[in-house]
């Protein structure tokens, strides 16, 4: 397995350069790889590497910070539009005959959500967060942003606010922050309680940013009207993940 520490160490123990993506490079692995001189992460996020340990050993860690800016932001909006229009559901049920058997000319199982005039709160306002904000603004949305670093370009796209304000005022919350030890399970029972009733959640950053049981509970109770996620805490997704039930 690509996450099995002994196998990773065995594969890397005689190498000078490790090129990885989802493979965790832990202290245990680094201790077992005395020849390692460079770690290249084929992703923007580099949370799979114990960077503190790598630094102690003098091993540089490289990532690819801008390879997916356009595609990831586009997909975030695609996930949001799916929540608003349930396109997949209506395609599937129309093919199953639901529209053909409908008494009215208009077949729709869910009300549509119009985004113009609504507020999107973007947590993490780097390249991808800002690109997502530009698309949201083009759809007529108001953009709020929360980020440890502010920029003039960010201010042209949206308004920087503290996290509590963003949670309280946003109709849609989209996550675009890196995963750190400080923000693991950022979206949990307490932060969800601060959100608007019926808020929508989008996450194509890192699955560990969510407490998945708390998000599932919020979806089942109706506190969250929907969540569109293409990342989970363990990938491939486990069959017992609460978000699947």
Per-region residue spans from a language model:
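N-terminal Rossmann-fold NAD(P) dinucleotide-binding loop
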Residues: 129-130
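Phosphate-binding beta-alpha-beta segment of Rossmann-like dinucleotide-binding domains, i.e.
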Residues: 57, 65-119
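Short, well-ordered coil/turn residues at beta-beta hairpins
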Residues: 21, 42, 79, 176-179, ...
């Amino acid at each position: 397995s690509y996450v099995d520490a002994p196998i990773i160490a065995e594969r890397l123990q005689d190498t000078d350069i490790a090129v990885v993506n989802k493979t965790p490079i832990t202290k245990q692995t680094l201790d077992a790889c005395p020849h390692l001189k460079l770690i290249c992460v084929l992703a923007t996020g580099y949370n799979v590497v114990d960077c503190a340990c790598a630094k102690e050993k003098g091993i540089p860690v490289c990532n690819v910070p801008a390879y997916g800016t356009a595609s990831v932001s586009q997909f975030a909006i695609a996930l949001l539009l799916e929540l608003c229009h349930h396109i997949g559901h209506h395609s599937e049920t129309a093919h199953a005959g639901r529209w053909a058997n409908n008494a009215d000319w208009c077949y729709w199982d869910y009300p549509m959500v119009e985004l113009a005039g609504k507020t999107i709160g973007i947590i993490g306002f780097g390249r991808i967060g800002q690109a997502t904000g530009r698309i949201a603004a083009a759809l007529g949305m108001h953009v709020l942003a929360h980020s440890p670093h502010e920029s003039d370009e960010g201010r042209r796209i949206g308004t920087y606010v503290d996290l509590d304000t963003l949670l309280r005022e946003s109709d849609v919350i989209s996550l675009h922050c890196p995963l750190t030890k400080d923000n693991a399970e950022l979206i949990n029972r307490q932060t969800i309680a601060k959100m608007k009733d019926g808020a929508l959640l989008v996450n194509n950053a890192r699955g560990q940013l969510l407490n998945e049981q708390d998000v599932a509970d919020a979806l089942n109770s109706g506190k969250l009207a929907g969540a569109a996620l293409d990342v989970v805490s363990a990938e491939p997704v486990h069959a017992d993940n609460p978000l699947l039930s």
